[in-house]
Amino acid sequence: DMMILLSAFCNFYPYARSIVLGEDWPDTKTFYRKRAARILPSYYFMLAIDLFFYILPGHKYRNVGALCKDIVTHVFCVAPNWSDTYISTSFNGVLWTVQMEVIYYLLLPWIARLFRKWAFATYSVMLMISVTSTAVILNCFAGKERNYGNNILTFMGIYANGMLCCILYVMWKKYVTENKYSRLAGTVISVLCIFLMNGMIHKYDGDVNLQAVQLQSRLVQSFLFALFLFSTACAGEYYQKLYSNRVASLFCKFSYNLYLWHQMIAVWLKEKRIPYWSGDTPPNMTGDRVWQWKYQILIIVVSAAVAVA
């Protein structure tokens, strides 16, 4: 959820500058072309690897119809709209978030135009879409939140908060004269947000109905993360270096591929019993901390190597 809000902030930034500062309006075709070049090649490559080296050799589908539906919905980035192509898919489990982003990219230039004319009304409608869809799922599909909870409607409020945060940040930079006190306040608020977000996450950790709790708290958590994002952007220079430095810049160059590959590699390593484990119950379910640390480090190292390659 946090990465989706961050994506909303970053992709809306040129539009926010145009709205607030009067800069040239971003060209829609150029935006689509850049976004497609950024995410689709790696995404489709991952689909192909999944299909030809895992799904087809392993005969993962009971019939051709189910296989074709899963392929088509993943190719067109609409798989989360059906529970069988979302929950029961044999494709890489992280790909649904990429599909969510693709839909947002398609909508963003048009939502931005609405923001330019009716900012408050557009933001309010996006929030209401998120609140209403969440309420419908929680009340009409109780116990099936995992099947229906992650879609563009429930995430609409997350995108709205990211876009609002972006506009407020551009306005802050234009109208507010920053000083050591404002930067100190930004730093303190940012650190406080970290503790609050950590507390919120641990509060529902282990809940028997985790998906329902996550869905209920999604919007509130997005407000908190938006505040963290805004305050960090307005914080002191030395504090900002924790997030903006050469290591972070290097990581950004391959972070998308790392995200795409990490789960597939994690599953493959465990299936191949690397690091080695015996018995029928995986060590992550028996509390073997030593194995878990080895496994975690191996996932990071192998995933990073594949992502860079």
What is the predicted function of each stretch?
Residues 28, 32, 36, 67, ...:
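Hydrophobic, aromatic-rich alpha-helical transmembrane segments
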Residues 1-16, 97-113, 126-178, 194-199, ...:
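Specific transmembrane alpha-helix
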Residues 24-33, 39-100, 131-145, 157, ...:
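Membrane-interface helix-loop-helix regions
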Residues 117-125, 176-188, 291:
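Membrane-interfacial entry segments at the cytosolic side of transmembrane helices
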Residues 17-22, 54-63, 117-121, 139-145, ...:
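Transmembrane helix-loop junctions in multipass membrane proteins, especially transporters and channels
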